[in-house]
């Protein structure tokens, strides 16, 4: 089937839109513009949008289970954010020895832990890493030597973590144990040049992986073995991430970036797609 694509009407374009996350308790899709920098949101019932500027790059936002506030990934590190009080409380910086790095993308596993990647802001050093933030607000470095650590997602049963190094055009798979240990790092998929660079990912209810293609103007659906099932072209070159949203989890939202392609009318837009499949329920941070 052909995907129905809608461009969400709003007053701004994102310079680097990323990290869409559905928060059903609020009826909102949240995402970030890392380079504005700003937090964005869309009310799915009213189609109204909102924004909250930040004084430093913000890489992602994740709700906390049973609470009204969020965890966010800033250039300065992990922090708690209360939207209503408009207050940020720092947790800590997982990379104090890498002042040019910033947190880039994150997801929550079935145990309520956040898995967050980092990257070198000028993208000239292989100093990115993969960190795990536990519900007790302590963190641990789990893997390293990434150019641009990006797009974590999980298998349907939660036993495999998928994580990419965009700079290397490679998506890796890890075995994820119940205690949060990673083993068996392996290449899941290497992008050919025509595919651009792998960016954000999400998993659907069938266990298939949806992945954004930076530089190639599309998203793709892959089976759990990494075989291409479907590719959907979008009217923007730099596609950054995707997430299922809505009460039925049947609306796929896709972020994009206008950086470097400002001449493209739809670059930096938020797209909504009807792709005929549903997503997995979103997870909140357990701490």
Per-range role (PLM):
Residues 4-10, 47-53, 89-96, 137-144, ...:
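A short beta-strand motif characteristic of beta-propeller blades
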Residues 11-26, 55-73, 97-113, 143-160, ...:
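Beta-rich, blade/repeat-based domains predominating
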Residues 23-24, 29-35, 71-76, 114-124, ...:
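Conserved beta-strand positions in repeat-built beta-propeller and related beta-rich domains
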Residues 38-40, 77-79, 128-131, 170-172, ...:
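A short loop-to-beta-strand structural motif that recurs across blades of beta-propeller domains
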Residues 169-170, 174, 190-227:
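Loop/turn-rich, solvent-exposed surfaces of beta-rich toroidal or solenoidal domains
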Residues 243-287:
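Blade-level signature of beta-propeller repeat domains, shared across WD40, Kelch, NHL, RCC1
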């Amino acid at each position: 089937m052909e995907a129905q694509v809608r461009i969400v009407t709003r007053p701004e374009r994102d310079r680097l839109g990323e990290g869409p996350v559905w928060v059903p308790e609020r009826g909102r899709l949240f995402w970030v513009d890392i380079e504005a920098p700003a937090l964005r949101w869309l009310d799915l019932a009213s189609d109204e949008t909102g924004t909250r500027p930040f004084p430093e790059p913000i890489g992602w936002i994740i709700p906390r289970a049973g609470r009204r506030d969020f965890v966010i990934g800033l250039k300065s590190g992990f922090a708690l954010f209360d939207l209503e009080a408009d207050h940020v409380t720092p947790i800590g910086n997982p990379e104090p020895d890498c002042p040019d790095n910033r947190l880039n993308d994150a997801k929550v596993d079935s145990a309520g832990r956040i898995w967050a990647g980092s990257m070198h802001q000028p993208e000239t050093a292989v100093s990115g890493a993969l960190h795990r933030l536990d519900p007790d607000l302590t963190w641990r470095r789990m893997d390293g030597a990434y150019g641009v650590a990006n797009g974590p997602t999980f298998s349907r049963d939660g036993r495999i973590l998928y994580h990419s190094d965009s700079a290397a055009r490679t998506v890796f798979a890890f075995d994820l144990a119940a205690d949060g240990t990673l083993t068996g790092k392996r290449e899941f998929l290497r992008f050919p040049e025509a595919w651009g660079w792998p960016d954000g990912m999400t998993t659907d209810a069938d266990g298939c992986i949806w992945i954004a293609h930076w530089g190639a103007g599309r998203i793709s659906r892959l089976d759990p073995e990494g075989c291409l099932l479907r590719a959907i072209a979008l009217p923007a070159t730099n596609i950054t991430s995707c997430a299922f949203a809505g009460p039925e989890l049947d609306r796929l939202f896709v972020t994009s970036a206008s950086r470097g392609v400002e001449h493209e009318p739809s670059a930096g837009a938020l797209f909504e797609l009807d792709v005929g499949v549903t997503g997995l329920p979103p997870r909140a941070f357990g701490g």
